[in-house]
């Protein structure tokens, strides 16, 4: 072990600054302790007060979100949020980002991101039933991007498939702004009975703190601080800040923890995942939530490396570890339970009532600080914000109108854009069927899983078009929530609530912080209008490479409930001669669109204001029509407009369509919001048109083959087979390029 600097040396050399603490924060710690903090204590404060653990820069933003509703059983503040779905059951879900680690070590970064979010779900007492992921990369023409993409996908499928939780959905987009800073956001969904909900608390004087799972190593030390800094190309050496995951160990940990929660409620007090900032974070949070204090004895912590310092043990982010609080005297029983799963459980401390966090090592006290100072009292900053220069420039631009010579060729080109193209090559590597509950496979608007023992099903999706947020963070934020809800509704489900991963640049730059601040207003407004509170989430700031920030990317994960499995709907046209309807009006919405990107090579301009009331009305009508059994298929209109939505609806069952739209050709590719493509059996035509009224435009019918779309001044005409092949092969073709 190295000789640790003395408190005086730490202060004089400003060592704390290397760990991310400012001078003001260091002085605040001195005031709290009434002395200079020692080496270990300085380390504890530096991670617990990092943005990643304390949300010190984003708390004022998060206050904007609605977090309550009649269906919400647990909002933000625990491992994950919980929503009631009736029948004594609830759904538990949360999303997490693992962006910085995945940029450095893409396979392990993505795999441990999946592992961490799964632990958050089962620490609540829920059985994880599904994984989704939201990924962002640079352009696939770049060799390093292809490597990152391949490894991240392999890491997600490697972990998810081994632990036996199906990866059922997600979304992937490619933009130059993610070149040096990919985004890897993972979402996990679990099921729980109301009477088995578990909280992460450590209370009751003398009760024991048990450490369970994998041994502690030196991996991931300062991972939380690493995630709270900007990225520079030189940082690819920071591999020790990336952890290595073991999905087989996690599978045992999952079963053991659920066994403990289900069958030993009498002795279990609290349970929490050791995630960011490892042991210090989980133990301090558990004590702080319960208003208790703690004593930890580090000599008892299972270690897989020799001569680890207290600092290293407390900050290690080794994977597959949980912290459990149990009744005094029950330690042996818990250890034996974990032994039956081949896992180690060790008592490493106890609960006190004095509110102090005391850590012993080698018979000496190495840290003695107030619990709340670590977990609750990090400073909160109201950052300065100002509208970016580009917004003023956008206001001066005339709206972009595409020039189209051949609509058929344009549709083919759009279908091959990586953001629109089929992601089949990705989701085929995921096991989406393990557990055998998956009813709607990846590739439709939302994934759907049935809830065993009931007639219900759950729909889930992740969504965000960051181009819209780049043009207008507030409207873009509204659209992200609205599109997620549209996907849930198109699958026949009632939207319940959201989780979010807020991926942004540095909060220290007023223009970046303005993006976070204003997009939160948009997200909050849409959540209120659509009745989907924010029940959990994660903030990932400092997503910049060499000073260039990513587009603002608030990934919205949404879950909805389908009361009766007979109402499950997919985007695929079902039968020849079914009628095709367009719900919602089409306007000249080309700014931020896929066609603008193709024709200009960039996106620019303003977004038209977005009518949330109309969005809500259209969603309610479509859901009603689905629930009364009048709809054969439903698909939301998104990137690429009506033309792409129609083509996608034809692909799954390789059918065709004959459609006539009273629009000029460019409008076939407009990305106006609040629109759906529905197909309806001719026998339901009258009932459907009576129910939907003027909102529905009957535009054509499903045919055996061929995509034929008539605009006022052009016709799209191509074979379904050819178009589908272009759409399916686009990403595999790009991946085969040589560097």
Swiss-Prot record:
Pathways involved: Purine metabolism; IMP biosynthesis via de novo pathway; 5-amino-1-(5-phospho-D-ribosyl)imidazole from N(2)-formyl-N(1)-(5-phospho-D-ribosyl)glycinamide: step 1/2
Catalysis performed (reactions): N(2)-formyl-N(1)-(5-phospho-beta-D-ribosyl)glycinamide + L-glutamine + ATP + H2O = 2-formamido-N(1)-(5-O-phospho-beta-D-ribosyl)acetamidine + L-glutamate + ADP + phosphate + H(+)
Keywords assigned by UniProt, alphabetized: ATP-binding, Cytoplasm, Ligase, Magnesium, Metal-binding, Nucleotide-binding, Purine biosynthesis
Residues involved in Mg(2+) 1 binding: 96, 538
Endpoints of the signal sequence: none
GO terms, biological process: 'de novo' IMP biosynthetic process
MF terms (GO), sorted A to Z: ATP binding; magnesium ion binding; phosphoribosylformylglycinamidine synthase activity
Binding residue positions for ATP: 55, 94, 500, 537
Localization annotation: Cytoplasm
Chain positions recorded as Mg(2+) 2 binding sites: 120, 273
Protein family per UniProt: Belongs to the FGAMS family.
Name the UniProt record assigns to this protein: Phosphoribosylformylglycinamidine synthase subunit PurL
Lineage of producing organism: Bacteria, Bacillati, Bacillota, Bacilli, Lactobacillales
Gene for this chain: purL
